[in-house]
């Protein structure tokens, strides 16, 4: 049996640094320890691991089936699951977000490998959505458990609806599932109610106390749980960032709160002027 990995938390809310892992010696024990650590810490930092493309693919496959992206270029035709993210080609993701929540089954996890990066700057930050939910008031928690939110991509071509509160498998902890980049509307509420509530949730979850931050070095690998975190790049450098990425596909298993109330979609009264035109500048 391989020696146990050393798991050292890096922040109070989430994140842990992993040492003792070799990219060319991935066994069942190491895989089990990584999966357990990810469930606990949500983000794992593997400094200086420097895997080959094949090794990086194999690490990702420990967590489930990997996505073959339809249009982001892959690094190697032999390993189509590994795509290339180049800051000189694609825009930096400097808004707090969870990836592709406009999908019917958003990803379970994601991995990044820093291939080329600046000497300093260009850090990445993550937020713990479980801690975010825990700190909400009890009345608001009760209200949120019966609500959903529609998410769409920036072009509006893809749309999905998800519960605002999700349950973490294995622990039963609840997490908030909205993000500023893709979350658009709470259909059970009027438009102004939805706008005000989402604005509050966005502000609440972006508090620094819920976050961790990683200063990249070439060769670093980061793995994170996409279901209960948000992330954002710190856009403070113009130097190139070249990363390899792998994404663990989601499944259709429901993470909704069991027995949560079900509310119908809000219907505005178009037979009344206030409902048709809105009042006070609001569109209902």
Please give the residue ranges for each predicted region.
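Non-heme Fe(II) oxygenase catalytic core, chiefly the N-lobe of the double-stranded beta-helix
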Residues: 2-221, 226-284
């Amino acid at each position: 049996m391989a020696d146990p990995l050393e798991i050292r938390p890096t922040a109070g809310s989430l994140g842990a640094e992993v040492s003792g892992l070799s990219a060319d010696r991935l066994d069942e024990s190491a895989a089990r320890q990584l999966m357990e650590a990810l469930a606990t810490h949500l983000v794992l930092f593997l400094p200086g691991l420097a895997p080959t493309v094949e090794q990086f693919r194999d690490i990702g496959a420990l967590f489930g089936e990997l996505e073959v992206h339809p249009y982001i270029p892959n690094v190697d035709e032999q390993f189509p699951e590994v795509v290339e993210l180049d800051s000189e080609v694609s825009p930096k993701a400097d808004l707090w977000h969870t990836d592709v929540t406009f999908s019917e089954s958003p990803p379970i996890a994601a991995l990044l490998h820093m291939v080329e990066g600046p000497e300093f700057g260009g850090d990445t930050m993550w937020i713990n959505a479980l801690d975010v939910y825990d700190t909400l008031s009890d009345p608001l928690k009760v209200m949120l458990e019966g609500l959903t939110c529609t998410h769409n991509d920036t072009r509006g071509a893809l749309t999905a609806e998800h519960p605002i509160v999700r349950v973490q498998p294995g622990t039963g902890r609840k997490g908030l599932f909205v993000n500023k980049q893709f979350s658009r509307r709470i259909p059970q509420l009027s438009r102004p109610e939805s706008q005000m509530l989402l604005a509050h949730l966005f502000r609440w979850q972006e508090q620094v106390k819920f976050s961790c931050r990683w200063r990249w070095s070439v060769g670093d690998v980061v793995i994170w749980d996409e279901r209960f975190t948000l992330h954002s790049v710190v856009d403070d450098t113009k130097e190139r960032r070249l990363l390899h990425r792998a994404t663990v596909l989601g499944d259709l298993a429901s993470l909704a709160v069991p027995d949560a109330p079900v509310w119908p979609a809000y219907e505005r009264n178009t037979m009344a002027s206030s409902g048709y035109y809105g009042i006070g500048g609001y569109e209902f």
